[in-house]
């Protein structure tokens, strides 16, 4: 990453994967107050992502946890959603499935067809996640939404959502 990013930017990417993402993304979604530190960090991380090359893949996977009611409000087929927070994903379906085995409370599998995700695994503290990160305020068109058998327990369903980056 050193050939693309300054040391400060590479450290910002690494910090994101350390768990810093949790408070940052909550603040960007409006769940907690956004501090000046988060505002500066958001700009630094977005600038770093702008400098990284696009990934060779265009299909990514993401896991989320939603109540059925909240899911129906957030994701409506044919509508555009703007993700105020950074959107983490993986280019490796098996990595997503493994995360689901580690935490069976994930009840939504999202397949993202994207063009601007940036592979950050080289700077990540968790390279096994094979993380691809989308900038804050990325917009996605909601495609198909349907129940599918859970990879963890095939007798139970999870929701599958297809998102297409705009």
Q: What do these predicted ranges mean?
A:
Residues 1-166:
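Mono-ADP-ribosyltransferase
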């Amino acid at each position: 990453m050193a050939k693309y990013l300054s040391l400060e930017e590479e450290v910002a990417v690494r910090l994101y994967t350390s768990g810093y993402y949790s408070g940052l993304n909550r603040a960007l979604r409006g769940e907690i107050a956004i501090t000046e530190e988060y505002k500066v960090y958001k700009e630094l991380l977005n600038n770093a992502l702008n400098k990284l090359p696009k990934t060779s893949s265009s299909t990514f996977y993401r896991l989320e946890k939603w109540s059925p009611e909240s899911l129906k409000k957030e994701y409506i087929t044919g509508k555009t959603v703007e993700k105020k927070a950074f959107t983490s994903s993986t280019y490796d379906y098996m990595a997503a499935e493994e995360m689901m085995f580690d935490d069976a409370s994930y009840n939504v599998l999202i397949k993202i067809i994207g063009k601007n995700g940036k592979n950050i695994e080289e700077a990540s503290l968790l390279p096994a996640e094979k993380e691809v990160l989308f900038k804050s305020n990325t917009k996605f068109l909601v495609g198909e939404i349907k129940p599918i058998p859970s990879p963890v327990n095939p007798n139970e369903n999870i929701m599958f959502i297809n998102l297409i980056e705009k």
